[in-house]
A protein has these predicted regions:
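Alpha/beta enzyme core
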Residues: 1-8, 15-32, 41-158, 170-181, ...
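Glycine-rich beta-strand-to-loop/alpha-helix junction loops that act as flexible
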Residues: 162-166
């Protein structure tokens, strides 16, 4: 799974070029395992554009929007994506820190919002459980694994995505995986 952000794609010349570069990399390196190309933390229009140019997966991040608008736009992204064979990740609650201009305070994902987002037809759910983007401060209290357990009980057997994986202690990541996290995003440690 290779993820691009809105900022990285803009810097590199756009989503179509990013997709072409990744495909060329896969071919020139002789990579034989399937490679998914994913948009991370995309706004509505960016998610639709990535679907149009052939990304295999998108994350629509409407967590900064009012809940009803987030759900409505997620459902529209799902409809267009699934019609084109593309999977969709969406976020409820907010992941703390900043990514591509989306700033989150790091609230815990409300359980009812998570259930409503899953009902839109998304394939993966990113949910705030105390995780943040960027370096973790020394006074960080850790993941709210009790909240993650409530979340996974509310949406059983549904793939949960843990953003902000850089800097989370291994034992907490392992505990989160045992509770239902199916994908862990890391990026900060690749940049520092």
């Amino acid at each position: 799974l290779i993820q691009t952000s809105m900022g990285a794609a803009k810097y590199m010349g756009g989503y179509k070029l990013c997709k072409a570069l990744i495909e060329e990399l896969v071919e020139s390196m002789g990579i034989t395992v399937p490679v998914a190309i994913h948009l991370d933390h995309g706004h509505y229009d960016d998610a639709l554009e990535c679907i149009r140019v052939g990304y295999t997966s998108v994350m629509f991040d409407g967590s900064h929007l009012p809940v009803e608008e987030n759900l409505e736009k997620a459902a529209k992204v799902v409809e267009f994506a699934h019609a084109n064979g593309v999977s969709v990740e969406a976020e409820v609650g907010t992941i703390g820190g900043e990514e591509d201009g989306i700033v989150g305070d790091g609230e815990l994902a409300p359980i009812e919002d998570a259930k409503a987002m899953v009902a839109t037809g998304v394939d993966f759910l990113a949910a705030g459980i105390g995780n943040i983007h960027g370096p973790y401060p020394e006074n960080w209290s850790g993941l709210h694994l009790d909240h993650l357990q409530k979340l996974t009980e509310a949406v059983p057997n549904f793939p949960i995505v843990l953003h902000g994986g850089s800097g989370i202690p291994d034992d907490q990541i392992q505990a989160a995986i045992k509770l239902g996290v199916a994908k862990v995003n890391v990026n900060t440690e690749c940049q520092i």
